[in-house]
Amino acid sequence: MLRGAVAVRYAEALYEIASREKVLPKYKSMVDRVEEELKAVDKVIRENSDLQKLLYHPRITAEEKKDLLQKLFKGKISDVTANFLALLVDRRRETFFGEIVAEFVKLANAGRNIITAQVTSAVELNDQEKGDLNRILVRLTGKKVKTSYAVDPSLIGGVVVRMGDKIIDGSLKTRLASLKERLLAIS
């Protein structure tokens, strides 16, 4: 089975479980809490190469890995998240954790009617331009938009917006390439 399909399947199962759990005072929902915990655990794992070596080593037993995770995160994560981590270890899916977290975040955002957009521009956008672009994206999608920004001077001018599997390319670089193709087709 492909890695992405495995990550989606586990993320969907966890999302379903978290969706059914009781709402907690500090959080709007258990989904919010689990999402926050998954991101925190993922950050700890990504930033600690020794921990990665232990978790991903095939000769270290599942029990040893679960004990390690339990010691690291006891009292810091919910039973839902702790049980999920144990399940991943039992099923030898711990190497999929980062991808599962990303898929869970997508599901949580979809449940909140939020879409993420990555905006790349040739130069840094000012606050007014960011606000204008965000309003346009909200109008186009009908959803709340979480936007991240990056600068790529090779675009020459304009912006490229990525939302899921959709790309809106308004860069001068692409327009010039298109014009070049049309001119070459004429000659």
Curated annotation (Swiss-Prot):
Annotated family: Belongs to the ATPase delta chain family.
Subcellular localization, as worded in the UniProt entry: Cell membrane
Quaternary structure annotation from Swiss-Prot or TrEMBL: F-type ATPases have 2 components, F(1) - the catalytic core - and F(0) - the membrane proton channel. F(1) has five subunits: alpha(3), beta(3), gamma(1), delta(1), epsilon(1). F(0) has three main subunits: a(1), b(2) and c(10-14). The alpha and beta chains form an alternating ring which encloses part of the gamma chain. F(1) is attached to F(0) by a central stalk formed by the gamma and epsilon chains, while a peripheral stalk is formed by the delta and b chains.
Keywords carried by this UniProt record: ATP synthesis, Cell membrane, CF(1), Hydrogen ion transport, Ion transport, Membrane, Transport
Major location category of this protein: membrane
HAMAP family, A to Z: ATP_synth_delta_bact
Primary role: F(1)F(0) ATP synthase produces ATP from ADP in the presence of a proton or sodium gradient. F-type ATPases consist of two structural domains, F(1) containing the extramembraneous catalytic core and F(0) containing the membrane proton channel, linked together by a central stalk and a peripheral stalk. During catalysis, ATP synthesis in the catalytic domain of F(1) is coupled via a rotary mechanism of the central stalk subunits to proton translocation. This protein is part of the stalk that links CF(0) to CF(1). It either transmits conformational changes from CF(0) to CF(1) or is implicated in proton conduction.
Any GO MF annotation of the entry: proton-transporting ATP synthase activity, rotational mechanism
GO cellular component: plasma membrane; proton-transporting ATP synthase complex
Name recorded for this polypeptide: ATP synthase subunit delta
NCBIfam families for this protein: ATP_synt_delta (TIGR01145), PRK05758.2-2 (NF004402), PRK05758.2-4 (NF004403)
UniProt superkingdom: Bacteria
